[in-house]
């Protein structure tokens, strides 16, 4: 029996086969399928992805909600990860999303972990340092979602910047026919990057959490003095908050290779407040220490640092 689909309403499916069939039928009618993969616990950052997907002419938006066990390592917060499915579906309904895909782990991995994606050397750096299996889990589930949904475009936030880079790498290396769209990080009024994990913070930790974005802003404003100056400025802000345990603060190029001497770069930070681990990053324009612009031209560092 064909799965039912009602246009203009939220249709929820748990079976991968049902989503594949509905997506195929919609594509045959000329609709353009957009995929927003999430692990639920939706917030305004996720909704920014949904809205970006909805802006595509002729689009039908599929939001997947799946807490992927493959990307959680030993001792990580899989069981504690917030699950708010009813609230999430209500949000999607209010945004005019037409398809929610909410599979179980058994539906996604019916044969266990028989075949997985090998993510390559970048998976051992930055986030992959303390979490060596994380990106194999991320890329495997995203690859599966792409095969199940067959979207024109897939949307990710820039907050998880390494994830975005690695998904682009997988799509290019495995010749997957999809456009990967990165959406700028959505922030609270004080600059904190929105994250499902922010709800773990107590009131004191929540006040201190803004240190990450403050450090990145300081780094961006110092970037006209060179990469080393940007790192020093950011580190000084982080060091002023002893409650913060910094896992890394690194400057890289846009593809997460070595930082350039000048031009576009990414400053990335990961830190813990209590048991909560927070990530953030910012794009910046590095200039030579002499203050002269490199061949990339204008002094863009003087603009708003949140042009990421």
From Swiss-Prot:
ATP binds at residues 39-46, 157-160, 186, 194-197. Pfam families: Pantoate_ligase. Keywords: ATP-binding, Cytoplasm, Ligase, Nucleotide-binding, Pantothenate biosynthesis. Pathway: Cofactor biosynthesis; (R)-pantothenate biosynthesis; (R)-pantothenate from (R)-pantoate and beta-alanine: step 1/1. One of its GO terms (biological process) is pantothenate biosynthetic process. GO terms for molecular function: ATP binding; pantoate-beta-alanine ligase activity. Its EC number is 6.3.2.1. It is found in: Cytoplasm. (R)-pantoate binds at residues 71, 163. Beta-alanine binds at residue 71. Residues 286-308 are annotated as: Disordered. It comes from the Bacteria. CDD domains: PanC. It catalyses: (R)-pantoate + beta-alanine + ATP = (R)-pantothenate + AMP + diphosphate + H(+). InterPro entries: Pantoate_ligase, Pantoate_ligase_C, Rossmann-like_a/b/a_fold. The active site is at 46 (proton donor). Homodimer. The reaction proceeds by a bi uni uni bi ping pong mechanism. Belongs to the pantothenate synthetase family. Catalyzes the condensation of pantoate with beta-alanine in an ATP-dependent reaction via a pantoyl-adenylate intermediate. This is Pantothenate synthetase. It comes from Mycolicibacterium paratuberculosis (strain ATCC BAA-968 / K-10). The lineage of its organism: Bacteria, Bacillati, Actinomycetota, Actinomycetes, Mycobacteriales.
């Amino acid at each position: 029996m064909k799965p039912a689909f009602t246009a203009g309403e939220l249709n929820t499916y748990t079976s991968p086969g049902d989503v594949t069939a509905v997506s195929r039928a919609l594509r045959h009618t000329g609709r353009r399928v957009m995929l927003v993969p999430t692990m639920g616990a939706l917030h305004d950052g996720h909704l920014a992805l949904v809205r970006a997907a909805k802006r595509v002419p002729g689009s039908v938006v599929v939001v997947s909600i799946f807490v992927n066990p493959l990307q959680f390592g030993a001792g990580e917060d899989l069981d504690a990860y917030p699950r708010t499915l009813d609230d999430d579906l209500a949000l999607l309904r209010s945004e005019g999303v037409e398809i929610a895909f909410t599979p179980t782990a058994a539906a996604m991995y019916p044969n266990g972990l028989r075949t997985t994606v090998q993510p390559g050397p970048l998976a051992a750096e930055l986030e992959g340092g303390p979490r060596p299996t994380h990106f194999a889990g991320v890329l495997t589930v995203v690859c599966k979602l792409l095969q199940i949904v067959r979207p024109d475009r897939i949307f990710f936030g820039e907050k998880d910047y390494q994830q975005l880079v690695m998904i682009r790498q997988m799509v290019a290396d495995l010749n997957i026919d999809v456009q990967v769209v990165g959406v700028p990080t959505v922030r609270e009024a004080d600059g904190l990057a929105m994250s499902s994990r922010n709800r773990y913070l107590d009131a004191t930790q929540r006040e201190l959490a803004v240190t990450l974005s403050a450090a990145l802003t300081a780094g961006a404003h110092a970037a006209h003095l060179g990469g080393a100056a940007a790192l020093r400025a950011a580190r000084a802000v982080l060091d002023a908050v002893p409650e913060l345990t910094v896992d890394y603060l690194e400057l890289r190029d846009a593809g997460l290779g070595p930082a350039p001497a000048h031009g576009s770069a990414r400053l990335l930070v990961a830190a813990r407040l209590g048991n909560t681990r927070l990530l953030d990053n910012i794009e910046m324009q590095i200039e030579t220490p002499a203050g002269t612009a490199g061949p990339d031209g204008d002094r863009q560092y003087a603009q708003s640092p949140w042009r990421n």
